[in-house]
Design a protein with these regions (language model features):
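A short, N-terminal "cap"/entry segment at the start of jelly-roll beta-barrel domains
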Residues: 1-17, 65, 94
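Short, conserved beta-strand element in jelly-roll/cupin
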Residues: 23-24, 35-50
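Conserved short histidine dyad/triad with adjacent acidic residue
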Residues: 6-8, 18-35
Length: 94
């Protein structure tokens, strides 16, 4: 299970970036999925692993993962405390 927080809703419109906090509880994961824009995952606390196109990297507090448009990505919480991330990506124009 995870909890998501939209932290950029108060930004005046139109905005060009979205920022969300995502807390992955112990044992939680965001399964592999394709992305159609670049994304940055910044770790606030906890430990985990991120996979992009089959390449696995460990992430922990203070580290960031830059994920590229067209990649298939996923992230998984590891350890005894939740993995708390800021996820940033561009807003798709409507």
């Amino acid at each position: 299970m995870s909890t998501a927080f939209r932290i950029s809703d108060a930004v005046p419109q139109p905005k060009s970036m979205e920022f969300r906090r995502r807390d992955l509880h112990v044992g939680a994961a965001i399964g592999s999925h394709p992305i159609d824009h670049d994304e940055v995952y910044y770790v606030l606390s906890g430990e985990g692993e991120v996979v992009a196109d089959g390449v696995l990297a460990l992430i922990s507090k203070g580290k960031a993962a830059y994920l590229y448009k067209g990649s298939v990505v996923g992230v998984r919480q590891m350890g005894s405390e939740p993995l708390s991330l800021i996820i940033a990506y561009p807003v798709t124009p409507k």
